[in-house]
């Protein structure tokens, strides 16, 4: 009997994409038919989250299966040397017989040079440029003409169409929908370099459309009544340095939201070419496809924007679409708590890796969820909570001392601000997500919630301890 071929893997990562910025996820006007097809023919996970909702740390968590506390990429400071030493799942896949490729944004360090674990490398320095970008192709770095999303789409499809005897693993990380920006080695960012830029053919797409705001899109004066940790940050947002950043990308406006949607049109076109390549080469049903964002984003919720770093649902929740017919029936909708830590162990598991290949990983393989669904069983044994953490950095001039550790369960969220207090009293937050899904009513001081707070603090302490060391 012929030995069954190992599955191929495609992970498509979008920069700054919110959980609701796809057609299938409820966007009121964005059309993403090719992306939506992943969830329509597979599974849509409606409770998928980022343990550290920030570009560099979360990307490192995706490829290592580890919390930022363990892998060490804790912010957007340029840790180029460290990023070469990460226990990247692609290196494990190479040992298991895979041909691997990274196409797109790396951003664990500002260098665009190839990292270990990849047979094919197409990337760019730092955030890159939307138009006529410098690309590093297998170590050859030079400027290329064109729109960056189109260029990356072409490189990804070229890799998929190559003849090979091995299974492949493609990590496809778009620059979209991040605006043009320059990030210094210390993590400070300049957003005055051109802002959001759709492809010229999509420049007027969705003109005049309106994105309805969520009930928690409140002015800062209202927010601080319930969330005192934000008092200093909101005061700093009105200074000249802060306004320069905010005004440069039209933060929180309908135009910002429209431009992001228009940028996604090129991403969706590329996904259409991916489908075509897989179908024409006969690889579609043997390929595990995952589509997600690298962190959330705020459109004015809790007075925030253009932040992504924070533990409210808009910041930590991700679209998470999976197509793999051997595991998920078309139209599956799953509400299990999954995180980006689960990607590396899932792919290594599917590739035939042993327990030793995953022993350094803190995420979980999705296999039990897939098998449980096929057998009609409940989610027994799956996680009931996860840690969310952020290490304050200096990217935005108003975000001073905003580090936190948080726990999110199926019912509650508890946020411990590690550097914030008001008159000597902690500024922590507690939300009952069942009765308050928009996190508008901080219950931390309620006498009736003392037991809940004590229990969550104990669970959080255990998660923090587990996150740090082996």
Annotate the PLM regions.
Residues 1-429, 437-470:
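Formylglycine-dependent sulfatase
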């Amino acid at each position: 009997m012929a030995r069954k071929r190992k599955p191929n893997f495609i992970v498509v990562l979008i920069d700054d994409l919110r959980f609701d910025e796809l057609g299938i996820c409820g966007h009121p006007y964005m059309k993403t038919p090719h992306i939506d097809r992943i969830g329509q023919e597979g599974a849509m996970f409606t409770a998928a989250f980022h343990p550290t909702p920030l570009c560099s740390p979360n990307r490192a968590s995706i490829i290592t299966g580890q919390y930022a506390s363990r892998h060490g990429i804790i912010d957007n400071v340029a840790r180029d040397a460290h990023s070469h030493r990460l226990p990247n799942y692609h290196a494990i896949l190479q040992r298991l017989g895979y041909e691997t490729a990274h196409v797109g944004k790396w951003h664990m360090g500002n260098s665009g040079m190839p990292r270990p674990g990849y047979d094919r490398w197409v990337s760019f320095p730092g955030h890159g440029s939307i138009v006529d970008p410098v690309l590093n192709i297998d170590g050859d770095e030079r400027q290329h003409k064109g729109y960056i999303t189109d260029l990356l789409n072409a490189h990804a499809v070229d890799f998929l169409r190559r003849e090979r005897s091995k299974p492949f693993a493609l990590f496809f990380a778009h620059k979209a929908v991040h605006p043009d920006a320059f990030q210094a080695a210390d993590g400070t960012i300049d957003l005055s370099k051109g802002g959001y830029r759709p492809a010229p053919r999509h420049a007027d797409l969705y003109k005049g459309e309106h994105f309805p705001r969520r009930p928690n899109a409140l002015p800062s004066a209202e927010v601080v009544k319930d969330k005192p940790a934000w008092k200093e940050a909101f005061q700093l947002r009105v200074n000249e340095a802060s306004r320069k950043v905010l005004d440069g990308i039209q933060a929180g406006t309908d135009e910002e939201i429209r431009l992001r949607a228009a940028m996604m049109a090129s991403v969706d076109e590329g996904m259409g070419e991916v489908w075509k390549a897989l179908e024409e080469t006969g690889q579609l049903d043997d390929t595990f496809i995952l589509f997600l964002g690298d962190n959330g984003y705020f459109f004015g919720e809790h007075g925030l924007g253009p932040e992504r770093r924070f533990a409210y649902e808009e910041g930590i929740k991700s679209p998470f679409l999976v197509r793999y017919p051997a595991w998920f029936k078309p139209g599956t909708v799953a509400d299990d708590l999954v995180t980006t830590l689960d990607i590396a162990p899932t792919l290594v598991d599917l590739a035939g890796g042993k327990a030793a290949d995953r022993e350094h990983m803190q995420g979980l393989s999705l296999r039990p969820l897939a098998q449980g669904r096929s057998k009609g069983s409940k989610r027994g044994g799956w996680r009931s909570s996860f840690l969310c953490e952020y290490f304050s950095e200096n990217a935005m001039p108003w975000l001073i001392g905003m580090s936190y550790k948080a726990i999110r369960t199926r019912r509650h969220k508890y946020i411990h601000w590690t550097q914030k207090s008001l008159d000597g009293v902690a500024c922590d937050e507690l939300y009952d997500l069942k009765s308050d899904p928009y996190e508008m009513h901080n219950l931390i001081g309620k006498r009736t919630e003392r037991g809940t707070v004590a229990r969550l603090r104990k669970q959080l302490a255990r998660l923090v301890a587990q996150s740090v060391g082996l």
